[in-house]
Amino acid sequence: MDYNRMNSFLEYPLCNRGSSAYSAHSAPTSFPPSSAQAVDSYASEGRYGGGLSSPAFQQNSGYPAQQPPSTLGVPFPSSAPSGYAPAACSPSYGPSQYYPLGQSEGDGGYFHPSSYGAQLGGLSDGYGAGGAGPGPYPPQHPPYGNEQTASFAPAYADLLSEDKETPCPSEPNTPTARTFDWMKVKRNPPKTAKVSEPGLGSPSGLRTNFTTRQLTELEKEFHFNKYLSRARRVEIAATLELNETQVKIWFQNRRMKQKKREREGGRVPPAPPGCPKEAAGDASDQSTCTSPEASPSSVTS
């Protein structure tokens, strides 16, 4: 059996020892370095107890020879034979783990502590190694669980807080649309025609329906005066139950109508003497009216 290949693996067993396994004084936190030269080429790390891994493989007989418990100041029962030494460890590390140092798994070079099961089982309270020795064993914990959890807790707490889904903020209330002056469009309300009483005009500018009496009085006044003074306009408006604006507009329209008639009347040929004015607008070929100087022959012809 090649024992040299087994020396390239380290074992860090769990040290969950009870209070009965220690003396009144506590064990030192670090072990004195050994003067023996280690077989493997890896230097010991101070966090594993200082020189813990170097003296563990100083013999080529196959099993690591470690310092007896008496040199560490910790009394352990010497139930293990002289060829086997109980594993020493620091009380601040986890269960036994197997660390391959440079060799593949197919070589079968793992340092398995199954051969120490019977000897480790006889220790007080037992060790949490992988041996199948008798005796109650405490539950195993992940290596460096407490230290790593404490060191990574702040960092992971920030990540977990970021991963948590934050509740969606309630949508802000839509502010009412502000109306500016340039957005306002001035629109005049539509004018609705109101049925007014006869003779009562409205100042809204709608068409006024005059009665026969009102029209007769306005025509009589227009025959005498084409233009009215303001005093006369107010008097006529009060007499006919109209307002001043209605009287003013009626006279304006009446003057425009008179001028139109005069323009149209200038195109009609003047009526011969002796004919009534009503016949002036008839056709020129009408011969109903004859001058007194006309001969009877011209009339018959």
Curated annotation (Swiss-Prot):
* SUPFAM superfamilies reported for this sequence: Homeodomain-like
- Report the subcellular localization: Nucleus
Question: Please, which domain of life does this record's source organism belong to?
Answer: Eukaryota
Compositional bias (Polar residues) at which positions?
A: 19-38, 55-70, 284-301
* InterPro entries attached to this UniProt entry: HD, HD_metazoa, Homeobox_CS, Homeodomain-like_sf, HXA1/B1/D1
Q: Where is this motif: Antp-type hexapeptide?
A: 179-184
Q: Which UniProt keywords apply?
A: Developmental protein, DNA-binding, Homeobox, Nucleus, Transcription, Transcription regulation
Name any one Pfam family assigned in the record: Homeodomain
Q: Which PROSITE patterns match?
A: HOMEOBOX_1, HOMEOBOX_2
Which residue ranges hold the DNA-binding region?
203-262
> Which SMART domains does the protein's record reference?
HOX
The cellular component terms of Gene Ontology attached to this UniProt record, alphabetical and capped at eight, are:
nucleoplasm; nucleus
Q: Where is this region: Disordered?
A: 19-77, 127-149, 255-301
Name the Gene3D superfamilies for this protein.
Homeodomain-like
Tell me the GO molecular function terms. Answer: DNA-binding transcription activator activity, RNA polymerase II-specific; DNA-binding transcription factor activity, RNA polymerase II-specific; protein domain specific binding; RNA polymerase II cis-regulatory region sequence-specific DNA binding
**Any single biological process term in GO:** embryonic skeletal system morphogenesis
What the protein does?
A: Sequence-specific transcription factor which is part of a developmental regulatory system that provides cells with specific positional identities on the anterior-posterior axis. Acts on the anterior body structures.
As for family, the record states: Belongs to the Antp homeobox family. Labial subfamily.
Q: What is this protein called?
A: Homeobox protein Hox-B1
This protein's species is Pan troglodytes (Chimpanzee)
